[in-house]
Amino acid sequence: MAGKQLSTKTVVAIGIGAAVFVILGRFVSIPTGIPNTQIETSYAFLALMAVLFGPVAGALIGFIGHLIKDATTFGPWWSWIIVSGVVGLLIGFISNRLKVEEGDFGWKKITLFNAVQAGAQALGWFVIAPVLDIVIYAEPANKVFVQGIVAGISNIITVGVLGTIIIAAYAKTRSKSGSLSKETS
């Protein structure tokens, strides 16, 4: 990385973010009835971190977090690990447009966030994950596309609801620029 390195704050966010992703993925997920496919709250947290720290942090939190989660359960499933990184990366690309650090996360920004996260999740779970499952693991197409569609839809909804609430709550803790005025005596 000639010239541009990650800040200490971002590196710490990646470490903590990956750890929280693992914990949420292991202990706060809901089975769907489709084999190896859960409703994951970890993607709402990944969206928050990607929005706050950008695409590199989002990609690394998703990738490292999913890798550790899989490694501590049934073993790494690389196609889905890669997609978690891709989803974090793509959501992170809008961090500069959303600027939630400035205390504003109104309807226009909520709409932009949800359009991007839904597009990122759809690309990742409806296309990339199933195709990689077929290429890497020779899994049957009908099985992996059903898993991808269920995972994608549940992640879109989870991030759309829980992710939006978390980001909006975070934005409310920030002072809007120009919201403070000097008192005259």
UniProtKB/Swiss-Prot annotation:
GO CC entries: plasma membrane
Protein's UniProt keywords contain GTP-binding: no
Pfam family name, one: ECF-ribofla_trS
Record bears the keyword Cell membrane: yes
Record's bilayer topology term: Multi-pass membrane protein
Keywords: Cell membrane, Membrane, Transmembrane, Transmembrane helix
Compartment(s) where it occurs, according to its Swiss-Prot or TrEMBL record: Cell membrane
Superkingdom classification of source: Bacteria
Membrane-traversing stretches: 11-31, 44-64, 74-94, 118-138, 149-169
Major localization class: membrane
UniProt similarity note: Belongs to the UPF0397 family.
HAMAP family (alphabetical): UPF0397
Protein name: UPF0397 protein BPUM_3679
Organism encoding this protein: Bacillus pumilus (strain SAFR-032)
